[in-house]
């Protein structure tokens, strides 16, 4: 069965990896490393949540994914604001799209837990 959240997280992680390779080629190592960690961690936590042991475990993993998503947004904003960093507006758009799906699922999960 297709899972739009999982699919979108893989798409975003792949785009993050490609963008980080561009950053590394431009010798922007520090932010590249930070972005690579947070941007790929989103999907890792979403994938882990798919096999959660309980509803609480699922919610916890999804909350971690949202934190990583927000960190990823932060690094992308810094790159966009900097005059010496290449920007990747498509990546920012995809991260925002992933966030909308993620927040909706998390919100629904929290409400259904009560």
Q: Which residue stretches match the model-derived regions?
A:
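Short, C-terminally biased terminal segments at protein or domain edges
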Residues: 1-48, 52-114
């Amino acid at each position: 069965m297709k899972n739009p959240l999982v699919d979108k997280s893989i798409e975003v992680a792949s785009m993050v990896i490609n963008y980080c390779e561009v950053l590394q080629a431009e010798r922007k190592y520090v932010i590249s490393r930070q972005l690579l960690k947070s941007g790929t961690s989103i999907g890792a936590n979403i994938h882990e949540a798919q096999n959660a042991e309980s509803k609480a475990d699922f919610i916890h993993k999804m909350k971690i994914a949202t934190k990583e998503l927000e960190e990823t947004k932060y690094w992308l904003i810094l790159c966009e604001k900097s005059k010496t960093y290449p920007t990747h507006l498509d990546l920012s758009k995809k991260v925002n799209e992933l966030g909308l799906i993620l927040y909706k699922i998390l919100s629904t999960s929290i409400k259904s837990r009560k």
